[in-house]
UniProtKB/Swiss-Prot annotation:
Superkingdom field: Eukaryota
Record organism: Schizosaccharomyces pombe (strain 972 / ATCC 24843)
Protein name: Uncharacterized protein C11D3.10
Gene3D superfamilies: Aspartate Aminotransferase, domain 1, Type I PLP-dependent aspartate aminotransferase-like (Major domain)
Modified-residue entries (N6-(pyridoxal phosphate)lysine), positions: K216
GO MF, one annotated term: cysteine desulfurase activity
């Protein structure tokens, strides 16, 4: 079976979409619907616990296999550069709180960055770290020149998402890292909206670290994340991890005896727990094996094809998509329609369409389970709404985020359409002097 056939077969693994002509699921960027590859793996894990008196060694071995699969997907130079976390927030915070800095030093982020990145830095303000915000409203691509006016000799890090959750904007992480890493400035990337949906090469990106959750492009339940830390960056971080258990200690012995001169792993393994979320790692392993067989480049091309079809159909209805159409500057799977009238979200929900709503418009996002038929159905619903004379662009009176959708639920993005609190942060441009 070739890659395209495997992708098309994947829809049959998603029970939500089987025999269901009502639901049009276009909300991958919120969370992927459960698939049978993962649910079968989860049931297998439960059975191992039910009928095996000592399953833990097997689960630990599986964890290392999954770490290796992730290293292959990300093109990490070593699997030890990868550690498992609870989610993106934990992964980002582990790196943020490992950074060496002094009061008066600063970090630079976009003013509409995801809260998981933004508030992690903001929490360090009380200790003397300055957080500088780069205005990004109306901009749909960030590169090194975007950040340059805000960087100076006391800048310690730049934090950003590779793909912005509220616009589909794809930022040039590589350009940013190549410009600022040689100056001793770390680059911390949130890859949650990209991993599993388009190709990522962490060595080529040249980032210090990146983090992501596994419940979007990697098809897993919530509760599992990944942190990658470049082997080149480890020595530049604090010598002691933010929190420490036995898993962080390199020479931890089976006799479990404590010693005062503990030596921590000189890799991302220093952030590891003694016990991991083995059940979720089992689920991740199942999806990664499928994904690697299909090929991430094939996944990216398939999703881009759906995106091109969507844009073409929308243009025929005079409905625009915000941002660039060039995939160098836009994600492979996520598109925000410039539909500002909140009536549309309610109408789409009534028609069985699962999407997300932001201040900037309605977000449509694709997964491997989507086909061109979903686009045809969605466009039919849009035509129906237009025929009912529902205005497209009545701007809502206040900022909005992902709305309460009984078909979807509420995400941690619910506050993310609000800009980060500029009244407590520095957002003035500065002349770069390094």
């Amino acid at each position: 079976m070739n890659a395209l056939a495997k992708i098309k077969a994947f829809r049959s693994y998603v029970p939500l979409l089987q025999g269901n002509t009502k639901t049009i699921y276009l909300n991958q960027s919120f969370q992927a619907p459960m698939n049978m590859l993962v649910s079968t793996a989860l049931q297998g894990y439960i059975n191992e616990g039910l009928y095996n008196p000592h399953p833990k060694p097997m689960w630990k071995e599986r964890t290392e296999e999954t770490r290796s699969l992730l290293a292959k997907l990300l093109n990490a130079s070593t699997k030890d550069s990868i550690t498992f976390t609870r989610d993106t927030t934990e992964g980002l915070n582990l790196f943020q709180r490992s950074l060496k800095w002094k009061p008066g030093d600063n970090v630079v982020i976009l003013d509409n960055e995801h809260p998981n990145q933004g508030f992690g830095w903001i929490a360090l303000q009380n200790d003397g770290l300055e957080v500088r915000l780069v205005p990004n409203e109306g901009q749909y691509h960030a590169n090194a020149s975007t950040f340059a006016p805000y960087v100076d000799s006391r800048t310690k890090a730049i934090g950003l998402s590779s793909v912005m959750f509220h616009s589909g904007q794809k930022n040039d992480v590589k350009d940013i890292a190549n410009a600022f890493r040689p100056k001793g400035i770390h680059v911390l990337a949130d890859l949650t909206q990209q991993v599993g949906l388009s190709k990522i090469d962490v060595q080529d990106l040249n980032v210090s670290a990146c983090a992501f959750s596994c419940h979007k492009g990697l098809g897993c339940p919530t509760g599992l994340g990944v942190l990658y830390v470049s082997p080149l960056a480890i020595s530049e971080l604090r010598s002691t991890p933010p929190f420490v258990g036995g898993g962080a200690v390199e020479d931890f012995k089976e006799d479990l005896k404590l010693k005062l001169n503990a030596k921590y792993h000189q890799s991302a393994l220093r952030y590891e727990h003694t016990n991991n979320a083995y059940m979720l790692i089992t689920a991740l392993r199942a999806y990664l094996k499928f994904l690697l067989k299909v090929g991430i480049s094939n996944v990216e091309r398939y999703l881009q094809g759906l995106g091109k079809d969507l844009i073409k159909e929308l243009e025929s209805l005079n409905v625009s998509v915000i941002g660039y159409k060039d995939f160098d500057k836009h994600s492979s799977h996520s598109y925000v329609l410039k539909i500002l009238n909140p009536e549309w979200f309610d109408f789409l929900r009534q028609q069985g369409v699962c999407v997300s709503r932001f201040e900037s418009g309605i977000r449509v996002s694709f997964g491997l389970y989507n086909t061109s038929k979903d686009i045809i159905k969605f466009i039919s619903v849009i035509r129906k709404g237009l025929a009912l004379n529902i205005p497209l662009n009545i701007r809502p009176p206040q900022r909005i985020a992902v709305m309460d959708n009984p078909l979807v639920g509420i995400s941690d993005e619910a506050i993310a359409a609000m800009k980060l609190p500029a009244n407590t942060l520095s957002n003035r441009p500065l002349a770069a002097n390094i």
